[in-house]
Amino acid sequence: MSSKSQLTYTARASKHPNALAKRLFEIAEAKKTNVTVSADVTTTKELLDLADRLGPYIAVIKTHIDILSDFSDETIEGLKALAQKHNFLIFEDRKFIDIGNTVQKQYHRGTLRISEWAHIINCSILPGEGIVEALAQTASAPDFGYGPERGLLILAEMTSKGSLATGQYTTSSVDYARKYKNFVMGFVSTRSLGEVQSEVSSPSDEEDFVVFTTGVNISSKGDKLGQQYQTPASAIGRGADFIIAGRGIYAAPDPVQAAQQYQKEGWEAYLARVGGN
């Protein structure tokens, strides 16, 4: 596990080189939560209702905006307003995976207008380094307008059974993150990757990549489609800074109560990890 994982969110925020990661750690500390809720619902009303009800207990809301049947300006403006009201970030789980020219248009153009409202996006590096370079280039362009309020997570590992996001793929994810560290704030992975070394790159004292771990569920070990779950304690024990929970929260009989339970367990696991630091 990365030595930075042993530090408090406050300590990491105070020295973090990435402005959005700094803000995220500050939100987590202020609200005492490391929960990201994956709001995989299919209407704007459901999404905004969940965001409003769960907002006080989460650090991030994760969307799959293209599964909404009625995406519109109301969706964008509603999400932005609730993010401000409840002090959380928005993570669009678009998983960009195409040539650079295409992903630039998908991110900063098109009907979904992702760059306008999503603080965090993610990508797979299967197309190669160019996808990370292209997204970073877009975010640093003079006419971008959102600057340090946007960041990228590289999908370095997945929790689904038989995932091919392993080995050299994961190592290259870390290499690209180090090269484009001004825009890449961290990874979606099952563990801390800060100690990964290769012929291309090695850890530096100042780097502090944020780790989001998916597939966190208190009451289930998996589903029929290959998803493999772990608990908040096991995820954070392996190096997760933020836990991503979907059905365990939004499909619960009482989503608010479920979010509070994940908040409690996630925060206790974080406190246990940092000890007296």
From Swiss-Prot:
Q: SMART domains annotated for this entry?
A: OMPdecase
**Pfam families (UniProt xref):** OMPdecase
Q: Does the keyword Lyase apply?
A: yes
Reaction(s) catalyzed by this protein? orotidine 5'-phosphate + H(+) = UMP + CO2
Gene Ontology biological process terms in this record = 'de novo' pyrimidine nucleobase biosynthetic process; 'de novo' UMP biosynthetic process
Task: Tell me which residues bind substrate.
Answer: 40, 62-64, 93-102, 229, 247
Keyword vocabulary terms for this entry: Decarboxylase, Lyase, Pyrimidine biosynthesis
For this protein, the Enzyme Commission number is: 4.1.1.23
Signal sequence extent: none
Superkingdom per UniProt: Eukaryota
The UniProt entry, under InterPro entries, shows:
Aldolase_TIM, OMPdecase, OMPdecase_AS, OMPdeCOase_dom, RibuloseP-bd_barrel
One cellular-component annotation, GO: cytosol
Q: Which residues form the active site?
A: K95 (proton donor)
Tell me the protein family, please: Belongs to the OMP decarboxylase family.
| Name of the molecule in the record | Orotidine 5'-phosphate decarboxylase
Organism the protein comes from:
Aspergillus awamori (Black koji mold)
Species classification: Eukaryota, Fungi, Dikarya, Ascomycota, Pezizomycotina
